[in-house]
Amino acid sequence: MRDLAPDIFRQRLLIEGWYTIDLDRDGVARYLGEVAAHLGLRTYAEPIVYSPAGLGKRENQGYDGFVPLIDSGISAYVWSGPRFFSVLLYTCTGFDEAAAVEFTRRWFQARGDVASRSF
């Protein structure tokens, strides 16, 4: 992808995997707050988490969460049926990508491989 704004620092990391823990709305909010704290990223509001509550396709039910950072934000998308998660960390300050992946893997008690890509 071509960098259209080379003077603006951005670090983006996508992490995906299959979770084994019991997860609800509060759990998604806890993850968002804890991953930010673990990486030393500063939040300016509490995480917000939404659930479509039966709207849309059954296989897409789960949670969508976001925590705003002083330097951008973290989003989490969780599918309840297949027990799949997809997390996007987007910051205008640097963070340790390996620490983010390992924290996420452990927090979700991921089964099998966890995939990640920075861009």
Q: What are these language model-derived features?
A:
Residues 1-119:
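Polybasic/polar functional segments that serve as interface/processing modules
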